[in-house]
Amino acid sequence: MLPKIALVGRPNVGKSTLFNRLIRKNRAITHDRPGVTRDRMEGLVQSIGHPSFILIDTGGVILDSHYSTINIIDELHGFEKDIFQQVQLAIEESQAICLIVNARDGLLPFDEHLALFLRKTGKPILLAVNKVDGIEKEDQIVAEFHILGLPMIAVSAEHGHNIRQLENELSLLLPNNENIKDQSTAQAALKLAIIGRPNAGKSSIINAIIGKNKLIVSNIAGTTRDSIDIPFIFNKTQYLFVDTAGIRRRTKITDPVERFSVNASIKSATKANITLYVIDATEGITAQDKRLLDLLDTRKIPFILLINKTDLIAKKQKTLLSKSFKEELQFCPHIPILMVSAVTSSGLDQIIAMAEQVYLECSTRINTGVLNRAMEEIITRHQPPVVRRIRPKFFYLTQAETSPPTFVFFVNDAEKISETYVRYLERSLRKIFNLHHAPIRIRLRSSHKKRNQ
């Protein structure tokens, strides 16, 4: 595993902007308002000539100087306590720490308080004085931070000032025995996006599977705002969870930060190998859920439906509930539906296994000769309907793509093939080649010649 460095600081010092700058992606949500980052987010930092490492962006902790450095966690409440626990976990996992302060604000009591707290960890610390852009007498402004007694660098996350030097300084904090390791394994990890309406239990499911409280869990809708990548190992295999913000109806989103989160959620689903769509069993499938599930199905995005919080449903009702979900989702009958509970861990062991199965189906490549023998069998069993006294002719079948499997039928006149018959072709291919849950595309192409075998 690659070494980790945690970005730590009070709210609105520019941690997320610096995180985005270092990983060279617009992953963390940034906004000129304290407290936008709530969960910790991880990203890969790679630069020529320097060891690669994982950077952790953490939420800002709002503390006053009267808090003790020993019993901070006991003196906090609500979100402040949850966020600080995430910061502590990030620090524990990291080999080094980057403390971020705001040059525009100057040295504040909490900066000193936090520096003292971080020193007690015994881990290497680099002080990054951010937002130095446009400040006259930069050296004089930065000088006051020397009192913290930490190695320091002045940067501007927004304008990229001294970012390369920062990368170099951060890499020097890492132990030599944990330096560069091939990242191909991580890149090849199966990526699972997890989306759904707010408070459906997405973060709870992730926490239950990986066995760590990586994400803040709350009964307040909208707790998770960023799309967060979480690498983990399950049965000696590496995976990557992408936990995204809950999706609400766009007309109800007035907060610009939350609107950004919705866009990020949909984007994450298109980039992942498999998407997990979480629904609260006590609320059922809403009209918004149906629209989004239909969108995933239309775009041929492989997904699994997770019905969470089944521990709140009576045993006799679970069978009826599963049946009702299947009836409501007749427009995508191939989608697997798993009844799970993050609280009791019921059904969670099925999620990874099903994701692997769907991914394997999506990667299926079938020989052209095998496909054409299957096509002959399919058409012999049920020929296409006659249109204007002429029965459409099928010449041959080929597979154009994988992920999702895309099959192209060459026929004499594609316009004469009905949608009903296309659905028959899809059902038949699924049955013959065991493509039970993967989305597949069926394309018809007009041709006047039968390909030479």
Curated annotation (Swiss-Prot):
<dbReference type="InterPro" id="IPR027417">
    <property type="entry name" value="P-loop_NTPase"/>
</dbReference>
<dbReference type="InterPro" id="IPR015946">
    <property type="entry name" value="KH_dom-like_a/b"/>
</dbReference>
<feature type="binding site">
    <location>
        <begin position="308"/>
        <end position="311"/>
    </location>
    <ligand>
        <name>GTP 2</name>
    </ligand>
</feature>
<dbReference type="InterPro" id="IPR006073">
    <property type="entry name" value="GTP-bd"/>
</dbReference>
<comment type="similarity">
    <text>Belongs to the TRAFAC class TrmE-Era-EngA-EngB-Septin-like GTPase superfamily. EngA (Der) GTPase family.</text>
</comment>
<keyword id="KW-0690">Ribosome biogenesis</keyword>
<feature type="binding site">
    <location>
        <begin position="196"/>
        <end position="203"/>
    </location>
    <ligand>
        <name>GTP 2</name>
    </ligand>
</feature>
<keyword id="KW-0342">GTP-binding</keyword>
<dbReference type="InterPro" id="IPR031166">
    <property type="entry name" value="G_ENGA"/>
</dbReference>
<feature type="domain" description="KH-like">
    <location>
        <begin position="364"/>
        <end position="448"/>
    </location>
</feature>
<keyword id="KW-0677">Repeat</keyword>
<feature type="domain" description="EngA-type G 2">
    <location>
        <begin position="190"/>
        <end position="363"/>
    </location>
</feature>
<comment type="function">
    <text>GTPase that plays an essential role in the late steps of ribosome biogenesis.</text>
</comment>
<dbReference type="GO" id="GO:0005525">
    <property type="term" value="F:GTP binding"/>
</dbReference>
<dbReference type="GO" id="GO:0042254">
    <property type="term" value="P:ribosome biogenesis"/>
</dbReference>
<feature type="binding site">
    <location>
        <begin position="243"/>
        <end position="247"/>
    </location>
    <ligand>
        <name>GTP 2</name>
    </ligand>
</feature>
<dbReference type="InterPro" id="IPR005225">
    <property type="entry name" value="Small_GTP-bd"/>
</dbReference>
<feature type="binding site">
    <location>
        <begin position="130"/>
        <end position="133"/>
    </location>
    <ligand>
        <name>GTP 1</name>
    </ligand>
</feature>
<comment type="subunit">
    <text>Associates with the 50S ribosomal subunit.</text>
</comment>
<protein>
    <recommendedName>
        <fullName>GTPase Der</fullName>
    </recommendedName>
</protein>
<dbReference type="GO" id="GO:0043022">
    <property type="term" value="F:ribosome binding"/>
</dbReference>
<feature type="binding site">
    <location>
        <begin position="9"/>
        <end position="16"/>
    </location>
    <ligand>
        <name>GTP 1</name>
    </ligand>
</feature>
<dbReference type="InterPro" id="IPR032859">
    <property type="entry name" value="KH_dom-like"/>
</dbReference>
<dbReference type="InterPro" id="IPR016484">
    <property type="entry name" value="GTPase_Der"/>
</dbReference>
<feature type="domain" description="EngA-type G 1">
    <location>
        <begin position="3"/>
        <end position="178"/>
    </location>
</feature>
<feature type="binding site">
    <location>
        <begin position="57"/>
        <end position="61"/>
    </location>
    <ligand>
        <name>GTP 1</name>
    </ligand>
</feature>
<dbReference type="Pfam" id="PF14714">
    <property type="entry name" value="KH_dom-like"/>
</dbReference>
<dbReference type="Pfam" id="PF01926">
    <property type="entry name" value="MMR_HSR1"/>
</dbReference>
<keyword id="KW-0547">Nucleotide-binding</keyword>
